[in-house]
Amino acid sequence: MKSLIIVNPADCIGCRTCEVACVVAHPSEQELNADVFLPRLKVQRLDSISAPVMCHQCENAPCVGACPVGALTMGEQVVQTNSARCIGCQSCVSACPFGMITIQSLPGDTRQQIVKCDLCEQREEGPACVESCPTQALQLLTERELRRVRQQRIVASGENPL
């Protein structure tokens, strides 16, 4: 069953710990320094509200269809990347409705690297951003759990869902 990261902006304090944890969780893909800091999520701020934004792992991901060389594919849990196939055309960047894909060249390397959330598939503990958030503003939920949370919020708000 597909899992998703949900964010509660009311709990986010904008500390960017999630961004740092993300970079640390992907050390083989970049050097850890201020010049090359490539988190796969970005904390967005609007007035007094902040919230991390990341790939939504769309079911019919427009980025997958936009890539002319198949560097992005649909996996069971996430939109998967294959940077070895990437030609740097940035079609996927343009196609992403959330602006959450970056194409990056690392210093001293001519290859292109696709940078997007992969739900930290390589980590047994799950996404580093979820684990590191000091206020638990991020949660990893299955689609079933997400439906349950949505129903609870509707009931709590007293809204008529119809």
UniProtKB/Swiss-Prot annotation:
Residues that bind [4Fe-4S] cluster 3, according to the entry? Answer: C55, C58, C63, C96
> Residues that bind [4Fe-4S] cluster 2, according to the entry?
C22, C117, C120, C129
Provide the alphabetized UniProt keywords: 4Fe-4S, Electron transport, Iron, Iron-sulfur, Metal-binding, Repeat, Transport
Q: Which InterPro entries match?
A: 4Fe4S_Fe-S-bd, 4Fe4S_Fe_S_CS, RnfB_subfamily
Q: Which residues bind [4Fe-4S] cluster 4?
A: C67, C86, C89, C92
Query: Where does this protein hold [4Fe-4S] cluster 1?
Result: C12, C15, C18, C133
Could you tell me which residue ranges the 4Fe-4S ferredoxin-type domain spans?
Answer: 3-32, 45-77, 77-106, 110-143
The protein's GO terms of the molecular function aspect are: 4 iron, 4 sulfur cluster binding; metal ion binding
Q: Name one Pfam family in it.
A: Fer4_11
Output the CDD domains linked to this UniProt entry: HycB_like
**Per its record, how is this protein called by name?**
Putative electron transport protein YgfS
Organism ancestry: Bacteria, Pseudomonadati, Pseudomonadota, Gammaproteobacteria, Enterobacterales
